[in-house]
Structure formats: structure tokens, C-alpha cells
Amino acid sequence: MSQLQLLRAQDYPRMPWKNGGGFTEEITRDSGEGLDGFGWRLSIADIEESGGFSTFAGYQRIITVLQGDGMRLLVDGQPSRPLLPFDAFAFSGESQVSCKLLGGAIRDFNLIYAPQRYRARLQWFDGTSRLYSSASTVLLFAASSHVEVSMAGREVQRLGLYDCLRLEGNDELLGLEVQGRFCLIELISR
């Protein structure tokens, strides 16, 4: 049976960005210290003004706007589509990236992972969803103030805004019924 850990948003450690231009709240990671050595990491960042992103050589990134009007990224000189809330966008951590805010400040959600160590899948859902996963690590990130997660043989887990449920060591098909707006992240070791 998988190990379950409920992570509360008010407990996330706050740390400076790698480039020093802002702050990140780290939700969880697989291992490593500081800004190096992890195989994957989930975080939330507040972007108050347009500017450059940190580089993460050897990593893949998936970013999603959570709050605010959105942003447009410039990735290695190529403009992205406008990134609006709950519209995920992937890019290489090695890329030179800057953002242009479409309005005021935004809050975003980030998955950074090492593709040579993990395969990753990230999807957003809203409403009632019945899901099945055989990934060794499953993360459910709550993007609304009331998210309920039901699993066979376990009590219902209630998540508040930006809380995260981490299910680790899954060795069989995991069935979940989830109510609310949330992100499902599946990570499989290579």
C-alpha cells in the first residue's frame, strides 16, 4: 500500500529564486538540498513584475498560472501563447526564458523534473473525477478551497487551497475519486 502524506500550504518553506529575483514556496520534492540534486520538485511562485526566469540545466519545467491575468513567455527568443489560469506550458529548464505579465502580479505553479530520471505527466481537473494511476509517485494539488479525495481502504482526505496530497511507493493500480479543482501529477522513475 502506498504511503500517504498530506502537505498543508501554510507549512511550505519560502526560499529565494535561483536568480535572486523573487521567492518560491516549495511544496515538496523527491530529494536533494537547496536548488540542486532533486529529481523532481513542486513549487508555487509569486511573479510581481515582468522579467527573467532562473535556468535549470538538465531539467524539464511545466508551469501553470494559478492567479492573475496571466503571462506570455519568451523561450529562447520564441514567444509562447498567452498563458492564462490553469493552462499548463512545458519548456526546457536550460532555455533562456523571460515573462511579460498580461496585467498585474500572478501566482504560478511549477513542476521541475529531471527527464533522464523521471517520466512526468501533469493534468488539471475541475468537478468530480474518477482517476486511475500506476505511477510510483502521485501528487494531487488543490486549486480550490475544498478538494476531497477518496481511495479504497482509506479515510477521505480533505484539502484546502494549495494543499497537496503525496502518495508514494504505489505498486499497484491506484483508484481515486476527487471532487474540486486540482492538478494530478504522476511521476515514474526511469
From Swiss-Prot:
SUPFAM superfamilies listed in its UniProt record: RmlC-like cupins
Any Pfam family the entry gives: HutD
Domain of life: Bacteria
Name used for this protein in its record: Uncharacterized 21.2 kDa protein in hutC 3'region
PANTHER family, per the entry: PROTEIN VES (PTHR37943:SF1)
Family the UniProt entry places it in: To E.coli YdjR.
InterPro entries documented for this protein: RmlC-like_jellyroll, RmlC_Cupin_sf, Uncharacterised_HutD/Ves
Source organism: Pseudomonas putida (Arthrobacter siderocapsulatus)
